[in-house]
Amino acid sequence: MESIGVVAPHTMHFAEPLRLQSGSVLGNYQLVVETYGELNAVRSNAVLVCHALNASHHVAGVYADDPRSTGWWDNMVGPGKPLDTNRFFVIGVNNLGSCFGSTGPMNIDPATGTPYGARFPVVTVEDWVHAQARVADALGIERFAAVMGGSLGGMQALAWSLLYPERVAHCIDIASTPKLSAQNIAFNEVARSAILSDPDFHGGDYYAHGVKPRRGLRVARMIGHITYLSDDDMAEKFGRALRRADGALDAYNFNFDVEFEVESYLRYQGDKFADYFDANTYLLITRALDYFDPAKAFNGDLSAALAHTKAKYLIASFMTDWRFAPARSREIVKALLDNRRSVSYAEIDAPHGHDAFLLDDARYHNLVRAYYERIAEEVGA
């Protein structure tokens, strides 16, 4: 299928202060947005795609100055793809606190004239949703045909259906969870500790020192990446293969250099991540993950938390995902059924672990495609 082609982001500026869940207030702020497809005359075909930890507004297509800059969900969004931009107007928003253009730690704090750094306020999933709602307002979109996301993006989609029940017709929540387990919070804490203990972190003000806590970022990414893959997938990709030049002896070196292919892969992923991501942003986003728990205000009762939702739901999980296991998606499904909501659930046997939501699996994509066919009929797209 063809790509959507060359795209360009645009920056939206907001002067109305945004009060965050923490009580902090952001005054003037900006959000970077990309759109694909055409909004129909009655504005009924808009779909918001929410991004996960290290992604951004750049959902699909490529940039004119970098043909390798393919959007993070390009296999899902585009002409003739499961989310068909010939039929839907698709919006990607870069969240507050990110490092891809929206207001975040790298931006100048008006109060000091220097980058916010660690002074940037902690943000939550709910804060992101409220900011995204202002984007929708600015675009004249009263109601989304669907809000969709995978992983952390799925949490945002679920939060949309809770916070703005009148503005979401369908919620598509993939490889997600209603709250992080203690194990997941622990993974995030270890990753943050790697960053915080890097001598180049400088309390979050490393910009002024002209350095970056690369070592901490590398380790944080390596930890995270392990949790995104399944054991079977890692065994198939790497096994216990040694990293050796062609013709070299298949024997141990008896040192602490890279010995195994899996070590080489993790170091490569860590180095690549440290090149483009910001450490303060990593801290903010993982804390937002930790804090997401819509049932908390209802004494832990997820069914009560979802009682006022009005959307229809597609919930999907992957059998080999141990980061956000299918049991967590089934918790959402049960809570929705307790409230007699319309919900479709699929548990997909894909070998790639948590990252399966990003990959081109035929059964998964056919599921999403079929669901959007239903939405298209409803909105006349």
UniProtKB/Swiss-Prot annotation:
Catalytic reaction equation(s): L-homoserine + succinyl-CoA = O-succinyl-L-homoserine + CoA
Active site: S151 (nucleophile), D321, H354
UniProt keyword Acyltransferase present: yes
Signal peptide range: none
Site feature location: Important for acyl-CoA specificity: R323
Binding-site positions, substrate: R221, D355
Keyword Transferase: yes
UniProt cross-references to InterPro entries, sorted A to Z: AB_hydrolase_1 (IPR000073), AB_hydrolase_fold (IPR029058), HAT_MetX-like (IPR008220)
Keyword annotations: Acyltransferase, Amino-acid biosynthesis, Cytoplasm, Methionine biosynthesis, Transferase
Gene3D superfamilies registered for this protein in UniProt: 1.10.1740.110, alpha/beta hydrolase (3.40.50.1820)
Pathway: Amino-acid biosynthesis; L-methionine biosynthesis via de novo pathway; O-succinyl-L-homoserine from L-homoserine: step 1/1
Sequence ranges assigned to domain AB hydrolase-1 in this UniProt record: 45-360
EC id: 2.3.1.46
Gene Ontology MF annotations: homoserine O-acetyltransferase activity; homoserine O-succinyltransferase activity
GO biological process, one term: homoserine metabolic process
Compartment(s): Cytoplasm
Pfam families documented for this protein: Abhydrolase_1
Enzyme class: transferase
Superkingdom of this protein's organism: Bacteria
Family, per entry: Belongs to the AB hydrolase superfamily. MetX family.
Function: Transfers a succinyl group from succinyl-CoA to L-homoserine, forming succinyl-L-homoserine.
PANTHER family (UniProt xref): HOMOSERINE O-ACETYLTRANSFERASE
Subunit structure: Homodimer.
UniProt protein name: Homoserine O-succinyltransferase
Organism: Burkholderia pseudomallei (strain 1710b)
